[in-house]
Swiss-Prot record:
Protein name: 6,7-dimethyl-8-ribityllumazine synthase
Taxonomic placement: Bacteria, Pseudomonadati, Pseudomonadota, Gammaproteobacteria, Enterobacterales
Binding site for (2S)-2-hydroxy-3-oxobutyl phosphate: G86, T87, R128
Reactions this protein catalyses: (2S)-2-hydroxy-3-oxobutyl phosphate + 5-amino-6-(D-ribitylamino)uracil = 6,7-dimethyl-8-(1-D-ribityl)lumazine + phosphate + 2 H2O + H(+)
EC number(s) reported in the record: 2.5.1.78
CDD domains in UniProt: Lumazine_synthase-I
GO terms under cellular component: cytosol; riboflavin synthase complex
Organism: Salmonella heidelberg (strain SL476)
């Protein structure tokens, strides 16, 4: 039986991060966690990380697709926060972002890590951006690096 596994060290990786400006006070913590994980754990060089800001989570798939198709990046990490409100807007934005990002990964062959928080409250979002529940930005960055290495191992 052949088993393919990979680690997260990828010192030569070129990684883009797309990040939503809406809910920036939370997303800044996700970005800090992602960059820290990429550089400290993944050993990615600072010069190999590109950050692209977009207005909101709904715009993440389009920017992510442009980056994935550019041929310049080995992976894209998408970061944002969608907090449920009193209308159906949450479902449209969260669903559009999730489905769109999955479509980009499947269509481009470039790993797209989902670091978009979809929470019931601001408190839950803050917990997932570096307090009680860890930092989902860091987790997404490590997922991207592992997938870069998994795909390399599959192609080897």
């Amino acid at each position: 039986m052949n088993i393919i596994k990979a680690n997260v060290a990828a010192p030569d990786a070129r990684v883009a991060i797309t990040i939503a400006r809406f809910n920036q006070f939370i997303n800044d913590s996700l970005l800090d966690g992602a960059v820290d994980a990429l550089t400290r754990i993944g050993q990615v060089k600072d010069d190999n990380i590109t950050v692209v800001w977009v207005p909101g989570a709904y715009e993440l798939p389009l920017a992510t697709e442009a980056l994935a198709k550019s041929g310049k990046y080995d992976a894209v990490v998408a970061l944002g926060t969608v907090i449920r409100g009193g209308t159906a807007h949450f479902e449209y934005v969260a669903g559009g972002a999730s489905n769109g990002l999955a479509s980009v990964a499947q269509g481009s062959g470039v790993p797209v890590a989902f670091g978009v928080l979809t929470t019931e409250s601001i408190e839950q979002a803050i917990e997932r951006a570096g307090t009680k529940a860890g930092n989902k930005g860091a987790e997404a960055a490590l997922t991207a690096l592992e997938m870069i290495n998994v795909l390399k191992a599959i192609k080897a």
